[in-house]
Amino acid sequence: MTQNTFMEQALINAFKGLDLGEVPVGCVIVNQDNKIISQSYNKVIADNDPTAHAEINAIRQACVSLKSERLIDCSIYVTLEPCIMCAAAISKSKLKRLYYGADDMNFGSINGGFNFFQTKNCNHVPEIYDSISKIQCENLINDFFKGKRP
């Protein structure tokens, strides 16, 4: 499977969230054998939980699946640049690689004005790859917010 294949699955998850009225962000975590071990989408409204972002949900599932708080040889694919909370969870879980689609210039933790991974308190920095399926990811999030804020 390729980076684009995993991002396509993350996009499918984002659309599931969109169907429920959530901000459409989807996520997939794969192990070292490139097998999907968890996937999710934003469930903030559904769970009445401001921390129920796609990345947090998928990290929790992956940790349970692997019976470990560390995801050392795993990669995470997410349709939108992670926020600071999600970046901290990515760091704490020791994910090896982060792939994301669209930049988030408002709340992003990498290109959005504050790079969490460059702070002195960040104890693990994943390999970071941006702009995976960028156009599709940007269109999805931009169309959602155009509908909310005309």
Go through each PLM region and give its residues.
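Small-residue (primarily alanine) positions within well-ordered alpha-helices
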Residues: 10, 14-17, 27, 38, ...
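Zinc-dependent deaminase
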Residues: 1-20, 36, 69, 82-150
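Short beta->alpha transition motifs characteristic of CBS
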Residues: 37-45
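Short loop/turn microsegments at loop-to-beta-strand junctions
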Residues: 2, 23-26, 74
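Short beta-strand scaffold segments in enzyme catalytic cores
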Residues: 25-34
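Residues that line or immediately flank small-molecule/substrate-binding pockets and catalytic motifs
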Residues: 44, 78, 102
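Helix-adjacent hinge/juxtasegments
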Residues: 48-51, 56, 60-91
